[in-house]
């Protein structure tokens, strides 16, 4: 979703490969999104429903993209033998040290592997997104009546995410990002 359009990519998983079945977009005729936040929820819901009601989209789960400008990321190096709870606390502490609070941000992290030259450590990418942006997308998935399988950062790792095995057999990827 850009300020004036919604894009849909319908993918089908075939083994380890994702096959693109359909790529389409609809112009909205007005502003529906500004700085990653949905400004006209009803119009967006109607457009998304019309896209998802097309042939081939029945039963597809959603993967919604979060605009990169709504994300904050930090690369951290943590002890490899730390427990996931310890890593989570370290991620929260590091993000808090940069002024990112858990009250107004959703936080997550992704393990990236050992850093070069230090196999006893683990690199992680700590990511925080505005709760308003996340809640917008959760509400949109609920409004169109589709299960949400992920919220992926657009342009940062959406292509890599699409290559991974996390997608169900079929998924409709609604791009919620900035205008081209």
What residues fall within each predicted segment?
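Hydrophobic beta-strand segments of well-ordered beta-sheets in folded domains
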Residues: 60-64
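Conserved NTP-handling cores and scaffolds of large molecular machines
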Residues: 13, 52-55, 99-102
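Small-residue (GG/TT-enriched) beta-loop-alpha framework at ligand/catalytic clefts
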Residues: 1-26, 56-58, 88-90, 115-180
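Generic alpha-helical secondary structure
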Residues: 37, 41-45, 84-88, 130, ...
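Short hydrophobic alpha-helical segments used for membrane anchoring or interfacial signaling
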Residues: 11, 65-66
């Amino acid at each position: 979703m850009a300020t004036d359009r919604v894009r849909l990519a319908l993918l089908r998983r075939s083994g380890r490969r994702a096959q693109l079945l359909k790529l389409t977009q609809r112009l909205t005729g007005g502003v529906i999104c500004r700085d990653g936040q949905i400004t006209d929820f009803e119009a967006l819901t109607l457009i998304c429903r019309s896209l998802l009601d097309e042939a081939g989209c029945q039963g597809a789960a959603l993967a919604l993209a979060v605009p990169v400008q709504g994300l904050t990321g930090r690369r951290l190096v943590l002890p490899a033998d730390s427990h996931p709870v310890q890593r989570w606390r370290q991620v929260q502490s590091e993000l808090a040290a940069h002024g990112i609070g858990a009250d107004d941000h959703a936080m997550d992290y992704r393990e990236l592997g050992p850093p070069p030259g230090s196999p006893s450590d683990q690199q992680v990418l700590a990511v925080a997104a505005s709760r308003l942006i996340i809640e917008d997308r959760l509400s949109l998935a609920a409004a169109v009546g589709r299960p949400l399988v992920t919220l992926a950062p657009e342009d940062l790792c959406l292509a890599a995410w699409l290559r991974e095995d996390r997608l169900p057999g079929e998924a409709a990827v609604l791009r919620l990002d900035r205008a081209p």
